[in-house]
Structure formats: structure tokens, C-alpha cells
Amino acid sequence: MDIDALKASHMRHWNRFHQLAHSRRLTGPEIDELSVLYRQVTADLAKVRSQNPDQDVISYLSGELLHARARLTGTSGASLWAISRWFRHDLPAALYRIRYVTIAIMLIFIAMTALQTWWILRDPAALSMLGSPEQLKNYATTEFSSYYSQDTNASFMSYVWTNNAFIALRVVAGGITGFYPIMALWGNAQNLGISAAVVIHYAGPAHFFSFILPHGIPELTAIWISTAAGLRLFWAWLVPGRKTRGQALGEAGRSMITVGLGMVILLFLCGAIEGFVTPSDLPLWLKITCGVNLTAGVWIYTFVAGGRAYRAGVSGDLDEDAGYATPVI
């Protein structure tokens, strides 16, 4: 690599980077621009170090990066900016990276659940293995619906949120094993299929879907996304590409932590629906609309905001300059 040619082709954005890093005040768009340039200059520094370690250029870029990093973290309102950037760029980009895996998992889950439900409904022997007719009827007509009103709305919401958030984070973290997310997905599909078969057989499909759909659609979406995130972690370990296994796993891990935190937020909203909307006297269409709108919002957020952020070079990494790419003099 010709270092002079590199300097000539990159000097324009290096100068802009210097100008922003040394500005006394930065607007919101300028902070975003500085953040983007920070990643570009970090990549430039890595290229120089690996292909033509010119000490003058390395010292210059390292100094500029250190100054910019201090500028970003020391900017008034930087915490609010970081939170805003996380919602506008990091989280949607991380979701966008696993969008197709999430869709595939969704289809597999629906197929497994439908198959389990169909098999139990068509086979009286399979249904009888789940309990006596009296027990199953009591579950379908009483226990299934009373579950959603067993406590105060706020307490029940808190319970389901913390329980589901823990499951989602465990699925993401357990992704490194490769099999844990699949086992969790299979278990959820089987349990939902059994519940669906029993309730549909004894109380009818309307009774089942009226209690499941309002919160179930976005809640299951969170589980599917968490499963995809966990499997992405396993894939990074299995197939690191041109990076070392540690680098690939570290980057994927930080990105998937972003997804995990996003799912905690989504499941909080699901918990609010399950705790306050599902057991309420609202019209069924309005209950289902709440869940559908939340789910649609997640997918729009993923494809629109996520696609935009991903094309801008954002990966969802919690600290894209961390570890081996940290600029030091």
C-alpha cells in the first residue's frame, strides 16, 4: 500500500475529523458525523498498521482518535446522545443483521407448534395422556383464562416481564453452545402446541386466540429474535471468517448483547399488554390490534431504521473500537 496515496485519498475526511474533534461546540448532527468518521479513521489506522506501518501516520491518527474519543465522551449531553444513538443506530442495525434468521426461526416455530396442535387434536389417545377429561376441561375453561388475572395487573406484568426477559437473555447468552437456543425454541413450541390443543378441544379456538394473540404475537417475536441472536453468536464462533475466532466472537457477542437489551425493552411492553390489556374488558379487536401494532413497529424499525444504519456501516457493536481495534499511541 502506498502511504502517500492513502494520505491523499483520505486527507479530506481526516481534516474534517480533526475539525470536528477540536470544535468547541458540536450540534447533534455533528456528533453523529464525528462518530461515523471515528469508525472510518479507526479502520484507516488498522489498515496502515497491518499493511504499511508508517509511524508518523500511526501517531497522527492515534492522537486524533484519542482526542475525538475524549471529545465524544466529554461532550455535554453525551449520555443522552449515546442513548439516542443506541436506539437510532446500534439496536436497529443489530436487529437488521439477523432479520432473515429471525424470519426463518419464526416459520419453523409456527410449523412446529401447528404440527403439535394438529397431532394432539387428531389423536384422542395423545390428548388423554395429558390428563383426565375433567382436568383438561378445567384447565381450558378456567385456569387458562384466570392465569392472566391471578394478581394485580402491575404485579402480574412485573412477573411475566422479568421471567420472559430472563429467558430471552439466557437464550442469547446460551447461543454459544449452539444447541441451547434450539432446545428452548423446541420447548416453547411444544408447550404452546399442547396448550392450544387442550384449549381448542374443550373451549374452542376463539377462547384460545382471544387470550394468546394480544400479547403472544410480540412476545413470541422477542423469543424468535433472541433465538436468532444466540445462533448468530454460535455461528461467529464456528465460522469466524477472516477474523480470529476471538475477534469474531467478541464482535458478535457485543452486537448480540445489544439485541438482548432491546428484547428486555420489547418484553416490558409485552408484559404491559399481558398484564393490563389481555385480561381487560376491551373489545377483542382492540386487544389484538395492540399486539399487532407493537409487532409491526418492531419489524418496521428493523427493516427501515436498521437497514439505514446497516448501510451506513453500523454493526450494532456496543463498542466498535473496543479490544483489538482500540487506537493507542
Task: Indicate where each model-derived feature is located.
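Soluble N-terminal domains of membrane-associated systems
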Residues: M1-S84
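Short aromatic-rich membrane-water interface segments that cap or initiate transmembrane helices
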Residues: Y139-Y159, F209-P218
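Individual transmembrane alpha-helix segments
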Residues: T152-Y180, I194
